[in-house]
Amino acid sequence: MSISDNFLKKIFILLTLSSCQQDVASNDWTSLFDGKSLDGWEIKIAGYDLNDNYNNTYVVEDESIVVSYDSYDTFDEKDGNIFYTKKKFKNYHLKLEYKFYGDHIRDGDWSFRNSGVMLHSEDPYKIFKDQRVPVSIEAQFLGGLENRADGISTTLNMCSPGTDVDINGTIAPNHCMRSSSKVFPINEWVGIDVIVYSDSIVHHIIERD
């Protein structure tokens, strides 16, 4: 699992598992972020080696993982992802909160306040140095803009970098399929649940809706 760039993730990510060996679900939640460090996380920024945290892009502030562009003059397609690698998960329920804040550094409208969680993600150790996004299925976060140039303003959309996704028996016709969510403004925490059943079913839930 990886987290793509350009957002602030609040305090912790919690995850509940179904045992890979048993059909009995676990009610125990596991914190993926300790609120103090990036222990257990691996950074990959396009054009740089694994764990080269170029310009201190990923930092911990106020018990949150912050994606910071304070030291950037231009973006130059330096897409970044941060991967949780302590354990692999197959059947799980992921909970997190995110928000967008601050000014935007990118020029492309498609990328404006654009982030997400990359599910079924490619191993960061197998990603090419200049590769911008891991092969994955993305639960995409967008924020704070009613009239985007690409026409999509909802959050928790489904995007498919390098993958084909079957929705109700049909391969998704577009790279990104929009959700039915409302538009969430910047500087507002948004609660997200993503429920994954092996390689077959993914549920996206926003603010328990």
Name every feature range the model reports, one short phrase each.
Residues 14-15, 162:
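Intrinsically disordered, low-complexity segments enriched in polar/charged small residues
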Residues 18-19:
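C-terminal motif of bacterial Sec signal peptides marking the signal peptidase cleavage site
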Residues 5-14:
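Sec-dependent signal peptide recognition
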Residues 2-4, 26:
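Serine residues within intrinsically disordered or low-complexity segments
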Residues 22-209:
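Carbohydrate-interacting regions of secretory-pathway proteins
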